[in-house]
Amino acid sequence: MAMSFEWPWQYRFPPFFTLQPNVDTRQKQLAAWCSLVLTFCRLHKQSSMTVMEAQESPLFNNVKLQRKLPVESIQVVLEELRKKGNLEWLDKNKSSFLIMWRRPEEWGKLIYQWVSKSGQNNSVFTLYELTNGEDTEDEEFHGLDEATLLRALQALQQEHKAEIITVSDGRGVKFF
């Protein structure tokens, strides 16, 4: 089921691609950028990217307007997402990142709801089965990347609802 994406009105407004100097205006602008990034990545199920890929992506590059958010401004938007818990840098140079349109705790809650709803408590799953198995095809976490899945399962492990284990063909998880 593909969701359609509608660009927000700001995306068609050239000044949106220049961070504004006024503090209040800039805060609203950053909030709009953060919302756009999360919505775009959620729709495209995109969870990791480099800053250079981001700059060339339609997300920060409006070809029709011939406007592109500069790399320094993209870094500011990404840092704002990090402060909100929606982004994690994958390297110390801050050139690649994991984008989390849902925080790990939220993914964990969704996964655990499915486990409980489908009577799978006390069951063991491989990570592959959980995100790529037939049983989860209709779930939002189907197709979730392994890095985000592990963070979600670690959140569940802290709540004593799951335990990440080693199984014959890699890692797995047991739900309680």
UniProtKB/Swiss-Prot annotation:
Source organism superkingdom: Eukaryota
Subcellular compartments: Cytoplasm; Endosome membrane; Nucleus
Protein's UniProt keywords contain Cytoplasm: yes
GO cellular component: ESCRT II complex; nucleus
Keywords of the record: Cytoplasm, Endosome, Membrane, Nucleus, Protein transport, Transcription, Transcription regulation, Transport
Example GO molecular function: protein homodimerization activity
InterPro entries, alphabetized: ESCRT-II_cplx_Vps25-sub, ESCRT-II_cplx_Vps25-sub_N, WH-like_DNA-bd_sf, WH_DNA-bd_sf
Protein transport listed as a keyword: yes
Binding partners and assembly: Component of a complex at least composed of ELL, SNF8/EAP30, VPS25/EAP20 and VPS36/EAP45. Component of the ESCRT-II complex (endosomal sorting complex required for transport II), composed of SNF8, VPS36 and 2 copies of VPS25. Interacts with CFTR; the interaction requires misfolded CFTR. Interacts with the ESCRT-III subunit CHMP6 (via N-terminal half).
Functional description taken from the UniProt entry: Component of the ESCRT-II complex (endosomal sorting complex required for transport II), which is required for multivesicular body (MVB) formation and sorting of endosomal cargo proteins into MVBs. The MVB pathway mediates delivery of transmembrane proteins into the lumen of the lysosome for degradation. The ESCRT-II complex is probably involved in the recruitment of the ESCRT-III complex. The ESCRT-II complex may also play a role in transcription regulation, possibly via its interaction with ELL.
PANTHER family: VACUOLAR PROTEIN SORTING-ASSOCIATED PROTEIN VPS25, VACUOLAR PROTEIN-SORTING-ASSOCIATED PROTEIN 25
Protein name: Vacuolar protein-sorting-associated protein 25
Organism this protein belongs to: Bos taurus (Bovine)
